[in-house]
Amino acid sequence: AILTGVPYYILPSTSRAGFSPDNLRKNTSQPSCPLDLITQLRFPRRIGVPVIFTPQNSSLKVVPLSHNLNIHTCSDLWFCPESKIWTVKSSSIHRGLVVTTGGTFRSLGSWFRIERHGDSYKLVHCPRGSTPCRDVGIETVGGGGRRYLAPRDRPLAVRFTRASG
């Protein structure tokens, strides 16, 4: 069970390379604000930055499947003035919608859900807080093969690992 308010890493079910907002990556020369993409780290065993899941029903202690929730990057280090809450925004550079930070707590546009996907899970984005929702998958861009999260027809199978400490 995933507990409300507890930090977890989101990891692809087939890899140990996790995710991090661009503004926290050490190889970034300057912050990527305001469009701070959630990108996959290039090195296996780099598990990324943990997140906290907050269900729409704040009285729940366990995050339920297929219910609205906010995803909040859990890091004391932050270089952008925008919030740490995940949302989906349009990007002309990346030609479409991307998962980014700068969302608003408990508001339309910042709702995601965790759903079963075979033996794993998947994230879906529900912009209106209800259907239709769209699977969150991986998009690859550039010659370096930078991988970032975006609404896609093919979901990314993920698992969750509780952050220690």
Curated annotation (Swiss-Prot):
- Which one of the record's GO molecular function terms can you name? carbohydrate binding
State if Translocase is listed as a keyword. Answer: no
Gene3D superfamilies associated with the record: 2.80.10.50
Q: Report the record's disulfide bonds.
A: 33-80, 126-133
Keyword line: Disulfide bond, Glycoprotein, Hemagglutinin, Lectin, Protease inhibitor, Serine protease inhibitor, Toxin
**InterPro entries listed in its UniProt record:** Kunitz_inhibitor_STI-like_sf (IPR011065), Prot_inh_Kunz-lg (IPR002160)
Q: What Pfam families does this protein map onto?
A: Kunitz_legume (PF00197)
Q: Provide details of activity as a function of temperature.
A: Hemagglutinating activity is stable between 30 and 60 degrees Celsius.
Please indicate if the UniProt record lists Transmembrane helix as a keyword: no
Q: Which residues are glycosylated?
A: 27, 57
Q: How does it assemble?
A: Dimer.
Q: Which PANTHER family match?
A: KUNITZ TRYPSIN INHIBITOR 2 (PTHR33107:SF89)
Q: What does this protein do?
A: Glucose and N-acetylglucosamine binding lectin. Has hemagglutinating activity against human and rabbit erythrocytes which does not require divalent cations. Inhibits factor Xa and, to a lesser extent, trypsin. Does not inhibit neutrophil elastase, human plasma kallikrein, papain, human plasmin, porcine pancreatic kallikrein and bovin chymotrypsin. Has insecticidal activity against the termite species N.corniger. Induces apoptosis in prostrate cancer cell lines DU145 and PC3.
Q: Which family does it belong to?
A: Belongs to the protease inhibitor I3 (leguminous Kunitz-type inhibitor) family.
Write the protein's name: Bark lectin isoform 1
